[in-house]
Amino acid sequence: YLENPYENMSATFSLLSSISKHLECYVVAGFPERASDQTLREFGPTDIRHDARHKEEETISNAHLPRIPRKAYNSAMLVGPCGSLIKVFRKHFLYEVDTTWADEGPGFEYIELPRIGRLCVAICMDLNPYTLDTSFNKYELTSFCDRNQIDILVMPMNWLLPEEDIREVNKDLAQPSVPTINYW
Protein backbone atom coordinates (compact mmCIF):
# COMPACT_ATOMS: atom_id res chain seq x y z
CA TYR A 1 0.00 0.00 0.00
CA LEU A 2 1.44 3.33 -1.07
CA GLU A 3 1.29 6.06 1.56
CA ASN A 4 1.08 9.83 1.33
CA PRO A 5 3.41 11.03 4.11
CA TYR A 6 1.79 14.46 4.15
CA GLU A 7 -1.51 13.01 5.31
CA ASN A 8 -1.26 12.37 9.03
CA MET A 9 -3.31 9.21 8.55
CA SER A 10 -0.55 7.07 7.02
CA ALA A 11 0.35 3.96 9.01
CA THR A 12 4.10 4.63 8.96
CA PHE A 13 3.73 8.26 10.01
CA SER A 14 1.35 7.35 12.85
CA LEU A 15 3.77 4.75 14.19
CA LEU A 16 6.84 6.99 13.91
CA SER A 17 5.03 9.95 15.43
CA SER A 18 4.04 7.86 18.44
CA ILE A 19 7.57 6.45 18.90
CA SER A 20 9.32 9.80 18.47
CA LYS A 21 7.04 11.55 20.99
CA HIS A 22 7.37 8.71 23.49
CA LEU A 23 11.18 8.58 23.23
CA GLU A 24 11.62 12.32 22.52
CA CYS A 25 13.95 11.62 19.61
CA TYR A 26 14.23 11.65 15.83
CA VAL A 27 13.03 8.48 14.08
CA VAL A 28 13.60 7.30 10.49
CA ALA A 29 11.77 4.49 8.69
CA GLY A 30 11.28 3.41 5.12
CA PHE A 31 7.89 3.28 3.41
CA PRO A 32 6.37 3.05 -0.10
CA GLU A 33 5.31 6.59 -1.08
CA ARG A 34 2.48 7.66 -3.36
CA ALA A 35 3.54 10.95 -4.94
CA SER A 36 1.35 13.87 -3.98
CA ASP A 37 1.31 17.52 -5.06
CA GLN A 38 3.54 18.24 -2.05
CA THR A 39 6.01 15.58 -3.22
CA LEU A 40 6.29 17.10 -6.66
CA ARG A 41 6.70 20.64 -5.24
CA GLU A 42 9.70 19.40 -3.22
CA PHE A 43 11.48 18.44 -6.43
CA GLY A 44 12.30 22.06 -7.26
CA PRO A 45 15.93 23.28 -7.38
CA THR A 46 17.91 23.11 -4.15
CA ASP A 47 21.52 23.49 -3.16
CA ILE A 48 21.51 20.41 -0.91
CA ARG A 49 20.41 17.85 -3.52
CA HIS A 50 22.85 15.99 -5.73
CA ASP A 51 21.77 13.99 -8.76
CA ALA A 52 24.47 11.30 -8.85
CA ARG A 53 23.17 9.42 -11.88
CA HIS A 54 25.60 9.12 -14.78
CA LYS A 55 25.04 9.92 -18.43
CA GLU A 56 23.80 6.95 -20.47
CA GLU A 57 27.11 6.55 -22.29
CA GLU A 58 28.88 6.05 -18.96
CA THR A 59 26.83 2.98 -18.11
CA ILE A 60 26.89 -0.40 -19.78
CA SER A 61 23.11 -0.67 -19.71
CA ASN A 62 20.15 0.95 -18.04
CA ALA A 63 17.54 -1.38 -19.51
CA HIS A 64 16.13 -2.22 -16.08
CA LEU A 65 15.20 1.40 -15.36
CA PRO A 66 11.58 2.46 -15.79
CA ARG A 67 10.63 4.15 -19.04
CA ILE A 68 7.45 5.78 -17.74
CA PRO A 69 6.96 7.77 -14.54
CA ARG A 70 5.03 5.83 -11.92
CA LYS A 71 4.51 8.62 -9.36
CA ALA A 72 5.63 6.36 -6.53
CA TYR A 73 8.87 6.26 -4.55
CA ASN A 74 10.80 3.97 -2.24
CA SER A 75 11.11 6.54 0.55
CA ALA A 76 12.12 7.13 4.14
CA MET A 77 10.56 9.67 6.48
CA LEU A 78 12.26 11.57 9.27
CA VAL A 79 9.96 12.41 12.18
CA GLY A 80 11.05 14.81 14.92
CA PRO A 81 10.87 14.54 18.72
CA CYS A 82 7.50 16.34 18.79
CA GLY A 83 5.99 13.77 16.41
CA SER A 84 5.96 15.97 13.32
CA LEU A 85 7.17 15.07 9.83
CA ILE A 86 10.52 16.78 9.23
CA LYS A 87 11.55 15.47 5.80
CA VAL A 88 10.95 12.72 3.26
CA PHE A 89 13.98 11.23 1.50
CA ARG A 90 13.56 9.23 -1.71
CA LYS A 91 15.71 6.36 -2.96
CA HIS A 92 17.91 7.69 -5.74
CA PHE A 93 19.44 4.48 -7.16
CA LEU A 94 16.75 1.87 -7.73
CA TYR A 95 17.30 -1.86 -7.38
CA GLU A 96 15.84 -3.89 -10.24
CA VAL A 97 12.69 -4.90 -8.33
CA ASP A 98 12.05 -1.24 -7.39
CA THR A 99 11.71 -0.31 -11.05
CA THR A 100 8.49 -2.32 -11.28
CA TRP A 101 6.70 0.17 -9.04
CA ALA A 102 8.86 3.19 -8.18
CA ASP A 103 10.53 6.20 -9.77
CA GLU A 104 14.09 7.30 -9.00
CA GLY A 105 14.33 9.98 -6.35
CA PRO A 106 15.74 13.34 -7.48
CA GLY A 107 19.11 13.03 -5.73
CA PHE A 108 21.02 12.64 -2.49
CA GLU A 109 20.01 15.19 0.14
CA TYR A 110 20.77 16.22 3.67
CA ILE A 111 19.11 18.26 6.39
CA GLU A 112 20.59 20.31 9.24
CA LEU A 113 19.28 19.13 12.60
CA PRO A 114 19.75 21.38 15.66
CA ARG A 115 22.44 20.12 18.06
CA ILE A 116 23.02 17.08 15.83
CA GLY A 117 24.40 18.37 12.54
CA ARG A 118 23.97 17.35 8.94
CA LEU A 119 21.93 14.20 8.44
CA CYS A 120 21.75 12.35 5.12
CA VAL A 121 19.27 9.52 4.64
CA ALA A 122 19.95 7.14 1.76
CA ILE A 123 18.09 3.91 1.06
CA CYS A 124 19.67 0.50 0.45
CA MET A 125 20.82 0.48 -3.20
CA ASP A 126 21.96 4.11 -2.89
CA LEU A 127 25.12 2.65 -1.35
CA ASN A 128 25.95 0.83 -4.61
CA PRO A 129 27.15 2.34 -7.89
CA TYR A 130 24.35 3.66 -10.11
CA THR A 131 22.57 0.73 -11.86
CA LEU A 132 25.42 -1.55 -10.70
CA ASP A 133 26.95 -0.88 -14.13
CA THR A 134 29.30 1.96 -13.26
CA SER A 135 32.62 1.59 -11.53
CA PHE A 136 32.59 0.71 -7.85
CA ASN A 137 35.30 3.38 -7.52
CA LYS A 138 32.83 6.22 -8.13
CA TYR A 139 31.47 6.07 -4.55
CA GLU A 140 28.62 8.45 -5.40
CA LEU A 141 26.94 8.46 -1.99
CA THR A 142 30.08 8.63 0.12
CA SER A 143 31.52 11.31 -2.17
CA PHE A 144 28.34 13.35 -1.63
CA CYS A 145 28.62 12.87 2.14
CA ASP A 146 32.29 13.84 2.16
CA ARG A 147 31.79 16.89 -0.06
CA ASN A 148 28.90 18.13 2.12
CA GLN A 149 30.52 17.27 5.47
CA ILE A 150 27.68 14.97 6.54
CA ASP A 151 27.77 14.15 10.26
CA ILE A 152 25.34 11.22 10.24
CA LEU A 153 24.37 8.85 7.43
CA VAL A 154 21.22 6.79 8.08
CA MET A 155 20.47 3.92 5.69
CA PRO A 156 17.27 1.90 6.02
CA MET A 157 17.67 -1.26 3.95
CA ASN A 158 16.54 -4.81 3.40
CA TRP A 159 19.64 -6.79 2.43
CA LEU A 160 19.12 -9.97 0.50
CA LEU A 161 20.75 -12.96 2.12
CA PRO A 162 23.05 -14.86 -0.25
CA GLU A 163 21.63 -18.32 -0.98
CA GLU A 164 24.75 -20.03 0.34
CA ASP A 165 24.15 -18.37 3.75
CA ILE A 166 20.53 -19.40 4.29
CA ARG A 167 21.26 -22.73 6.00
CA GLU A 168 24.07 -21.27 8.11
CA VAL A 169 21.97 -18.34 9.30
CA ASN A 170 19.10 -20.62 10.23
CA LYS A 171 21.52 -22.56 12.48
CA ASP A 172 22.55 -19.47 14.45
CA LEU A 173 20.58 -16.27 13.90
CA ALA A 174 23.07 -14.28 16.00
CA GLN A 175 25.88 -14.81 13.48
CA PRO A 176 26.41 -12.25 10.70
CA SER A 177 26.45 -13.02 6.98
CA VAL A 178 30.19 -13.02 6.27
CA PRO A 179 29.81 -12.78 2.44
CA THR A 180 27.62 -9.68 2.87
CA ILE A 181 30.15 -8.11 5.24
CA ASN A 182 32.99 -8.93 2.84
CA TYR A 183 31.03 -7.37 -0.03
CA TRP A 184 31.03 -4.03 1.78
Task: Give each language-model segment a name.
Residues E7-A29, N128-W184:
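CN hydrolase (nitrilase-like) catalytic-core segments centered on the catalytic cysteine
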Residues R34-A35, F93-L94, D126-P129, W159-L161:
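Short, solvent-exposed loop/turn segments at secondary-structure junctions
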Residues W101-E109, V121-I123, L132-D146:
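A Trp-anchored, charged/polar loop motif used as the substrate-binding/catalytic surface
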Residues L2-A122:
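Catalytic-core segment of enzymes that process non-peptidic bonds
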